[in-house]
Amino acid sequence: MNVEQIVEAIEKLTVAELAELVKALEEKFGVSAAAPIAVAAAAAPAAGAQQAQAEEKTEFDVLLKGFGSNKIGVIKVVREITGLGLKEAKDLVEKAGSPDAIVKSGIPKNEAEDIKKKLEEAGAEVTLK
């Protein structure tokens, strides 16, 4: 496999696959690839570059869009996550669908996904922003 074939293979990778490749190369060779990530994103198609920017986001807000038929269950999970009192959690859940229905903001992606999963298991409709 020559260099051109390697480049062609890399061009076909998704943004997630590129991130995985970078991590593997960093571990294998003990280097940091901060600059090459930007180069790889610039070489990607416009849609891929937009996905890269979305994936580079480090802080997320968890927005409550709805509570379904299990309002009490959702309130309990909101209280557990936020530490709010019963009335405050109830008020937050009742704001579902409005821009003010932020359960938690400025948190890392993995924590935001965990919170989203817990809320969805309780019957809530949730989005990450």
From Swiss-Prot:
| SUPFAM superfamilies per record | ClpS-like (SSF54736), Ribosomal protein L7/12, oligomerisation (N-terminal) domain (SSF48300)
Please indicate if the UniProt record lists Ribosomal protein as a keyword.
yes
Question: Do the record's keywords include Cell membrane?
Answer: no
Question: Which InterPro entries does this chain map to?
Answer: Ribosomal_bL12, Ribosomal_bL12_C, Ribosomal_bL12_C/ClpS-like, Ribosomal_bL12_oligo, Ribosomal_bL12_oligo_N_sf
A single Gene Ontology molecular function, please?
mRNA binding
Q: Which branch of life, at top level?
A: Bacteria
The protein's matches in Pfam families, at most eight in alphabetical order, are given as: Ribosomal_L12, Ribosomal_L12_N
Task: List the GO cellular component terms.
Answer: cytosolic large ribosomal subunit
Q: Which UniProt keywords apply?
A: Ribonucleoprotein, Ribosomal protein
Biological process GO annotation list? translation
Function per UniProt: Forms part of the ribosomal stalk which helps the ribosome interact with GTP-bound translation factors. Is thus essential for accurate translation.
Q: Which HAMAP family match?
A: Ribosomal_bL12 (MF_00368)
Q: How does it assemble?
A: Homodimer. Part of the ribosomal stalk of the 50S ribosomal subunit. Forms a multimeric L10(L12)X complex, where L10 forms an elongated spine to which 2 to 4 L12 dimers bind in a sequential fashion. Binds GTP-bound translation factors.
UniProt family annotation: Belongs to the bacterial ribosomal protein bL12 family.
Please identify the protein, giving its name as recorded: Large ribosomal subunit protein bL12
Report the source organism. Pseudothermotoga lettingae (strain ATCC BAA-301 / DSM 14385 / NBRC 107922 / TMO)
